[in-house]
């Protein structure tokens, strides 16, 4: 007896293009630079931007703004949202994440023979004032230790 084979005809339809913007695209756009941030930093920043305040347990109609904290082992972000879920400001701190190549090269060119032993990446975002980014780097050369701040 021969096996019975079935075939299925699949219709293909062309769909119109849909562009979706996050409510907090300005926040993400202001953090964009020529050199991408370390992966854990980008992931947490995207989570902050995509946070849906109105469907969260924290949301109540009575409040004008909300402060929500986000944590990962490498860092944390404290974000302030308005009642519509738009990010007003953030304070961000990440420890020992990969430095951007330009920052790493600038440190090594300025301090030859020194090695980066620790780093802290600080970010402050404000919807009206923009963003400020600072790196605090600890350098070691044998028994000597040097702390450097870069912006």
Task: Report the location of each language-model feature.
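Short coil turn/linker residues within repeat-based beta-strand modules
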Residues: 22-25, 83-86, 143-144
